[in-house]
Amino acid sequence: VASKKLWVDRFWLVVKYALIAFATAFLIRAFLLIPVPVEGNSMEGTLKQGDMVVIEKISPIQRFDVVVFQLPDGSTYIKRVIGLPGESVKYVNDQLYIDDEPVDEDFLVKNRSNDHESASYTNDFDLESLLGVEKLGKDSYFVIGDNRRASKDSRSFGPISGEAILGNARFVYYPLTHIRLI
């Protein structure tokens, strides 16, 4: 009888720890870290088609963060934040300007072949010509893909709201040969 009670106690202890582990994993996945697949080549140079990234929902959005967001039509994208609320954004001769000040984009790998060296990597634009406004709105972010020539981003669908942002992409965990922080 004593050994049976010991076995039952151990069984319930294992069940209790398993439930705690599952609940913890569920809470982490639901509220902190979420796996997301990379689809398309608009972030080529930073992320590749088929990479799996983990996003987190806690950190505030900063310039050059790679974020995952959802548009009103339900489509999900992963892009880099270039412009923050209240800022003016423009590109002239492949140079990013925020509030008329030049900003370097050290992360950007310019995938140019020799025969396109004279071509612009990021076509010139400003918010006035794209959206008819000088500055981004109170909760608006301007996002753009690192592979500028092959990216559908804020240049085509406009700025995104902070509410649309699902989280910051923090690291690539698959494929195993590509594991790294973003």
Which role fits each region the language model picked out?
Residues A2-F11, K16, A23, L27, ...:
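Soluble "head" domains of membrane/secretory-pathway proteins
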